[in-house]
Amino acid sequence: MKKIFLDANIILDIFNPSREYYNYSLKFYNFALLSKYKLFTSCDLITTIYYIDSKKDTKQALLNIQDINKTLKVIEFSNKEIEETCQLMILEPQYKDLEDTIQYIMAKKYECDLIISNDKNFISKDIELITSKEFCKRYIK
């Protein structure tokens, strides 16, 4: 396992101790960095993270984004991936959430081995999907 895609909720967790999965997400994140995994997220999640974090503290939200920018590869998507996302959602009705489906398409494009998300509704047909808690129990001794 070398490439891991992070959903927005994982990134939000690592910067906010009051979130339910903070400890697991932070433990996963630190382990992944030390283990030299390649971590990915998509560009649209950066604005989502800023929007949520800036409600509490704008400067800290920007510092968090700078940290993400240094430790994760932020990947872009374009018309092609949007079309793939729409087609997948039309053909396979279990894909209901546009943002999550774009993340799945981007994880596939970058050949990620794993998607980490604490969203119980996230769908991933052919990339392993686990929570930060499951990752910690499975891979961190």
Q: In which residue ranges do the predicted regions lie?
A:
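Short, well-structured N-terminal submotif of metal-dependent ribonuclease cores
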Residues: 1-40, 54-63, 135-141
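Acidic, PIN/NYN-like endoribonuclease modules and their adjacent C-terminal/linker elements
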Residues: 3, 109-141
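Active-site phosphate/pyrophosphate-handling residues
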Residues: 9, 44, 101-105
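Active-site-proximal, substrate-binding regions of enzyme catalytic domains
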Residues: 26, 44-46, 50-74, 80-81
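Hydrophobic helix-cap positions at the C-terminus of alpha-helices
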Residues: 31-32, 68, 88
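Structured helix-beta-strand junction loops
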Residues: 34-36, 70-71, 125
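General small-molecule cofactor/ligand-binding pocket signal
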Residues: 40, 75, 130
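Active-site neighborhoods of divalent-metal-dependent phosphate/nucleic-acid chemistry enzymes
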Residues: 73-120
